[in-house]
Amino acid sequence: LVPFCVEESSIVAAASNMAKRCLKNGGFKTNNDNPVMIGQIQILDVEDLSVAKEAILTAKYELMAMCNSLPSTMIRLGGGCKDIEVRQIDTMSGPMLIVHLLVDTRDAMGANAVNTMAELVSGKIEEITGGRVHLRILSNLATHRLAKVTAEFTPEELSDDGTRENGSNIIKGILEAHHFAMSDPYRATTHNKGIMNAISAIALACGQDWRAIEAGCHAWASVETGTYTSMTRWEKNDQGNLVGSIETPMAVGTVGGASKVHPVARANLSILGVKSAQELAGIMAAAGIAQNLGAMRALATSGIQAGHMKLHARNM
């Protein structure tokens, strides 16, 4: 059972329907990144950006040791600052150096730990660079913490009448709908909203920071291509089956925050039976891709309103 907290019955119905249809091909397969979050440190008024960048990288292990000197259960369990990256960006306020602390937060979402580390090392970074540290804050674009899910559907499983011909026609319609979302940001916005219908419903049910998750997922949808596009990818393989995948940031936690103290969130995590934040991330991404396919299948066949309004009427 996967708990959803959402006002639309059709969201639950669509995701459940597609989850059933992929069982014969092994269901949803997940392969998630380690739970690494990014802490950003903004450095201004640097005389020589290249020299300052090299100085930070030379002092990397000293800075990491400072981060990991904090008394923390997360660090005792093998988490902590694992690497440091430095980026140069040009802005309307002039060039800046941006330090990224890469922090393994284990089963926590990790915002408080990452922010504490960023503030802790800021003085040392000013000393090393001769610059002025300004902002020190977690990034919600968790590009090192991606949830990755794939699923495969036969034409027979997607058909209305169990025949391969009907299912193949439906797959064609689904791919045409997907290509629309890939190429048009107006369509991609609604397409991705449907994916987040499921992801955010689980996030809310399980006491997660659903606003952070939403922000990260939508930002990631434009990072790779430079334009806003579909969060999912769909294609037909050599067997004529529909193969879908999603790869998106998923900063979730099973310890700390509301997931630990809110009784409903605790109960819902217990229903899920997840043992780690990575497992929760995979389930949420799987629900997202299931919901996406359910919406596209409806749009490509009978239209979205018939099933939606029928379930909507039951709620009234």
Map each language-model feature to its residues.
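Glycine-rich anion/phosphate-binding loop at the beta-strand->alpha-helix junction
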Residues: 107-109, 114-264
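A structural-propensity feature for long, helix-poor, extended segments
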Residues: 25-57, 163-166, 221-293
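Short, intrinsically disordered, mixed-charge
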Residues: 17-24, 65-68, 119, 123-130, ...
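Small-residue-rich
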Residues: 1-94, 99-102
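Electropositive phosphate-/nucleotide-binding environments in soluble metabolic enzymes
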Residues: 9, 53, 57, 61, ...
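Flexible, glycine/charged-enriched surface loops at secondary-structure junctions
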Residues: 27-33, 70-83, 128-140, 187-189, ...
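Glycine-rich phosphate/diphosphate-binding loops and the adjacent beta-loop-alpha structural elements
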Residues: 181-203, 288-291, 295-316
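Short, ordered loop/turn segments at secondary-structure junctions
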Residues: 7, 138-141, 301
